[in-house]
Amino acid sequence: MSTYDRRKYVWKLIYSHILGYDADFGHDVAVSLINCFNLKEKVTGYIAIGIMLNERSDPNIFVNCIETMKQDLTCGNEVREALAMSTLGNMGTPSLARELAPAIIHKSLQQTKACPLYVRKKACMCLLSFLKRQKQIFDEPVWIEGF
């Protein structure tokens, strides 16, 4: 199946999920789209993951998402970094917050030309989303060491 077809079918899954139908399949295709280098596929995958996944989803999918998001948060491309942080802010699961907190804190506190203002704003919004959803995570030493 071509990447165009995968992207098209994932958009159909997103649409059916938004309409309220049970779409508990196709998450692995969305994760494979996140791994693509083409921006269209990556955007589609991140939107699908952000909308369709929650705490009750398959843990194996979260492991794949964490690895891909770690790569995107440290790649240096501001669009990919912003996509990853937007999705993290929307999902906000405790496991994702614990795993990716150091990278997000680093991005929010970095004040060099290597980290544009847009990326720092996304990082701060992601941290705010984590704070609103799980206040108990901010008591852990990982967060305190970052600040």
Could you tell me what each predicted segment is?
Residues A23-L33, D58-L73, L96-Q111, I137-F147:
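HEAT/HEAT-like alpha-solenoid repeats
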Residues T112-M125, Q136-I137:
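A conserved hydrophobic secondary-structure block that centers on an alpha-helix together
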Residues E67, E78-V79:
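Outer-membrane beta-barrel transmembrane domain signature of Gram-negative proteins
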Residues R56-S57, E78, G92-S95, Q134:
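Short helix-coil transition sites and intra-membrane helix breaks within transmembrane domains
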Residues S2, R6, F37-N38, G76-N77, ...:
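Short inter-helical turns and helix N-cap capping residues of alpha-solenoid HEAT/ARM repeat scaffolds
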Residues M85-N90, C124, L128-R133:
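Helix-loop-helix module between adjacent transmembrane segments
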Residues M1-Q71, L88-G92:
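Alpha-helical solenoid scaffolds in large eukaryotic transport, assembly, and signaling factors
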